[in-house]
């Protein structure tokens, strides 16, 4: 029986999850919820089901795999990754996985705060000033490795790809000074299953965020 991934009909927190499900050739189907337009942003499609699914902490995204019912995007990623040994093998690799998992979430939240703010234009200018330093840290962490944890791909590469691609949409030149990050993005998009998925109608590069956002909501 296929797994069910539930989320809004946007990219958001499900992007890395969808990519990982495709890369691992997992059998899954999606339940995509639609949010209404302004000013009400009606969420009844989701709210009508929210407390009926047997989730411990009802939220989006969720993954249901038989008796396993999981919320929190990184918990979902780790669940899928454990099935395919994509969590790092040595202690050093696992440390790098843990660091990047949390760093990616921090950066994702920072960008989302800017994009959801009514003061978007002012916050964008401040964010762009910090962006080169932020990307430099990712570049240093990757170094000359093929993937962020070493020569074998792990689930945090899916998070890193999501973060880098988000920022390329936000500021298309943001990786110009970091050839290793540009190469990483190209290498990731060149993975056979990812490349095939990106050509399907199921693939959502945008909208980045829900309709409540000031930027990235289309």
UniProtKB/Swiss-Prot annotation:
Which keywords fit this entry according to its UniProt record?
Cytoplasm, Lipid metabolism, Lyase, Transferase
The protein's superkingdom reads Eukaryota
Q: Give the family, as the similarity comment puts it.
A: Belongs to the GST superfamily. Mu family.
From the Swiss-Prot or TrEMBL record, what is one GO molecular function term? leukotriene-C4 synthase activity
Give me the residues that bind glutathione, please: 7-8, 46-50, 59-60, 72-73
Q: What is this protein called?
A: Glutathione S-transferase Mu 4
The segment(s) forming the GST C-terminal domain are: 90-208
Enzyme Commission number(s): 2.5.1.18, 4.4.1.20
Q: Where is the GST N-terminal domain?
A: 1-88
Per UniProt, subunit arrangement is:
Homodimer.
InterPro entries hit by this protein: Glutathione-S-Trfase_C-like, Glutathione-S-Trfase_C_sf, Glutathione_S-Trfase_N, GST_C, GST_mu, GST_superfamily, Thioredoxin-like_sf
Q: What is one cellular component GO term in this UniProt entry? A: cytosol
The record ties this protein, via Pfam families, to:
GST_C, GST_N
For the ligand (substrate), the binding residues are: 116
A GO BP term, please? long-chain fatty acid biosynthetic process
Where in or outside the cell it occurs: the entry states:
Cytoplasm
CDD domains from the UniProt entry = GST_C_Mu (cd03209), GST_N_Mu (cd03075)
Reactions catalysed = RX + glutathione = an S-substituted glutathione + a halide anion + H(+); 1-chloro-2,4-dinitrobenzene + glutathione = 2,4-dinitrophenyl-S-glutathione + chloride + H(+); (13S,14S)-epoxy-(4Z,7Z,9E,11E,16Z,19Z)-docosahexaenoate + glutathione = (13R)-S-glutathionyl-(14S)-hydroxy-(4Z,7Z,9E,11E,16Z,19Z)-docosahexaenoate; leukotriene C4 = leukotriene A4 + glutathione
User: Has keyword Chloroplast?
Assistant: no
The entry's function note states: Conjugation of reduced glutathione to a wide number of exogenous and endogenous hydrophobic electrophiles. Catalyzes the conjugation of leukotriene A4 with reduced glutathione (GSH) to form leukotriene C4. Can also catalyze the transfer of a glutathionyl group from glutathione (GSH) to 13(S),14(S)-epoxy-docosahexaenoic acid to form maresin conjugate in tissue regeneration 1 (MCTR1), a bioactive lipid mediator that possess potent anti-inflammatory and proresolving actions.
